[in-house]
């Protein structure tokens, strides 16, 4: 759906408000809410949605919700001061192979050592670095391609069921 530049902020407001309403409804029912925002950097291109998301990010856990932001190019995300603050204060971050400029920015923001940087530099799919609190842990998440689990988890369309 292409709303164009004029209607995009209004469209985002409607969607974000709907998410907040669902979180509130689920809390009243004793349910957790899991929010996955793909290409999250797009929300930081508009001041209102960036501020709304910043507030939501800080409050959702109190409402039994868990927010996950996803982006392939961290550099796009880090253009926003609000996004940088959110990323720096996030307790859990998964980093896969990163482009050179993205690695440098992440290293500065998250205090990643040169050795730790090697885990997100020219690595195979499924390898990377996890930030949990103040700890950084390397990981290798390899599954045989001929398994159902692999077919469920792969992001490659030609390898899905």
Residues covered by each model-derived region:
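Conserved P-loop NTPase motor cores
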Residues: 2-120, 145
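Conserved P-loop NTPase
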Residues: 110-161
């Amino acid at each position: 759906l292409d709303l164009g530049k004029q209607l995009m902020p209004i469209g985002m407001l409607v969607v974000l408000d709907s998410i907040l309403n669902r979180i509130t409804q689920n809390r009243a029912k004793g349910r957790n809410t899991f929010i996955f925002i793909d290409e999250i950097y797009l929300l930081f291109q508009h001041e209102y949605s960036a501020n709304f998301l910043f507030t939501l990010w800080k409050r959702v856990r109190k409402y039994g919700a868990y927010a996950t932001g996803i982006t392939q190019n961290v550099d796009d995300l880090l253009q926003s001061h609000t996004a940088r603050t959110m990323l720096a204060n996030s307790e859990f971050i998964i980093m896969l192979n990163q482009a050179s400029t993205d690695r440098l920015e992440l290293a500065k923001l998250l205090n990643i050592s040169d050795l730790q940087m090697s885990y997100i530099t020219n690595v195979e799919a499924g390898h990377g670095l996890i930030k949990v609190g103040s700890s950084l842990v390397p990981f290798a998440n390899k599954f045989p391609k001929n398994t159902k689990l692999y077919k469920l988890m792969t992001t490659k369309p030609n390898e899905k069921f």
